[in-house]
């Protein structure tokens, strides 16, 4: 009985540690600063998708931009309330407030979910011949967002993942909160659907 209990505890421990690493890949994690070659190269654009703690995502994107990681910012997201400002425009306004010139910001205002974020933003990427982007979203959402963007962009554009490590909904103590478990179960389920369902469903 003791061995079974120890095994169960070990499995839970590995799950708690492993889930954040799986859901939130960070390709820039080992990069101290932009470099001329490799994963740490400057990107053509920093793409930030709305949802969850959107302000935290904008802050992370703006920080990367100010540090010289990308040449422009692209914000993607429709209006949460169809009578109001789109998420993308609200994100743009916040970025300008944080000190970014409008000249370096583009918006995509029609995406209602992650699949549409990828589909609609990919058009802009293709039309402007971008070859390398940094994708920013919440840590729990990074894996699925990357899968959706990879599906629609293909091998022609390099996608560099960089999640917001911690925000109002997610932290290293995700397992201690109901919303943490809700996000994990939801994301793992949606990733499963991604592999078996038609495109554009989530």
Identify the residue ranges that each predicted region occupies:
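Hydrophobic membrane-insertion alpha-helices, especially the h-region
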Residues: 3-19
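A structural signal for short, hydrophobic/glycine-enriched beta-strand patches
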Residues: 18-176
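Juxtamembrane/interface motifs at transmembrane-helix termini
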Residues: 6, 125-128, 181
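Hydrophobic, aromatic-rich alpha-helical transmembrane segments
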Residues: 1-2, 180
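A transmembrane-helix-recognition feature enriched in membrane-embedded lipid enzymes
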Residues: 176-202
């Amino acid at each position: 009985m003791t061995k079974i209990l120890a095994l169960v505890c070990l499995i839970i421990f590995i799950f708690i540690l492993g889930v954040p690493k799986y859901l939130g890949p960070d390709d820039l994690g080992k990069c101290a600063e932009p470099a001329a070659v490799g994963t740490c190269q400057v990107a053509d654009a920093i793409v930030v998708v709305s949802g969850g703690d959107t302000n935290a995502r904008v802050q992370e994107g703006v920080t990367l931009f100010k540090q010289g990681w990308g040449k422009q910012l692209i914000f993607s997201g429709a209006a949460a309330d169809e009578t109001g400002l789109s998420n993308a425009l609200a994100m743009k306004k916040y970025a300008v407030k944080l000190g970014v010139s409008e000249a370096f910001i583009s918006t995509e205002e029609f995406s209602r979910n992650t699949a549409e974020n990828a589909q609609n933003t990919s058009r802009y990427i293709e039309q402007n011949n971008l070859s390398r982007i940094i994708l920013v979203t919440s840590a729990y959402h990074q894996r699925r967002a990357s899968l959706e963007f990879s599906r629609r962009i293909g091998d022609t554009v390099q996608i560099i993942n960089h999640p917001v490590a911690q925000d109002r909904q997610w932290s290293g103590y995700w397992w201690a909160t109901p919303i943490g478990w809700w996000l994990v179960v939801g994301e793992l389920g949606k990733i499963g659907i991604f592999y078996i369902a038609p495109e554009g469903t989530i």
